[in-house]
Amino acid sequence: MARKVIALAFLLLLTISLSKSNAARVIKYNGGGSGGGGGGGGGGGGGGNGSGSGSGYGYGYGKAGGQSGGGQGSGGGGGGGGGGGNGSGSGSGYGYGYGQGNGGAQGQGSGGGGGGGGGGGGGGSGQGSGSGYGYGYGKGGGGGGGGGGGGGGGGGGSGYVGKHE
């Protein structure tokens, strides 16, 4: 008799435990974070110079069958000068994403940094730079990917792309 009672109690506990785990499986959570920062610098008249910079960071997390976990960051800056002035700008961005679950969950991160430099009138020059970094991670049947970044310059200046992974 005691064995039957113990067996029934064990069976009941097993049933409760399985129902809880199934309930947890159907929970869907989509998490995404984004961070953006931008800085701008104004120029000056005559022989004035202007510069600006910006940066951003983003983080996202998705769990238990959720389809999205992604973070993205972006930053940009610009400056300009009138007359014989110079302008420069730079930006950077970082993104991180993490996805965990069984329903094709995926994590993706993208960091796009755009730096724009405004030029100057007359003999002025413009310069811009940007960098971006992306990281993605997927667990439990999902995959992750990472994005990149870019930069540009204007006003007769130059631009380049920094870190791009």
From Swiss-Prot:
Q: Which residues form the signal peptide?
A: 1-23
Q: Does the keyword rRNA-binding apply?
A: no
Record flagged with keyword Signal: yes
Q: Which GO terms describe its cellular component?
A: extracellular region
Task: From the record, give the cysteines joined by S-S bonds.
Answer: none
Q: Which domain of life is it from?
A: Eukaryota
Q: Which InterPro entries match?
A: GRP1/2
UniProt-listed GO biological process terms: cell wall organization
UniProt keyword list: Cell wall, Cell wall biogenesis/degradation, Repeat, Secreted, Signal
Write out the annotated subcellular location: Secreted, Cell wall
Major location (coarse):
secreted
Renumbered ranges of R repeats: 56-62, 93-99, 132-138
Q: For the region Disordered, give the residue spans.
A: 105-125, 146-165
Describe the task this protein carries out. Answer: Responsible for plasticity of the cell wall.
| Name of the molecule in the record | Putative glycine-rich cell wall structural protein 1
Q: Which gene encodes it?
A: GRP-1
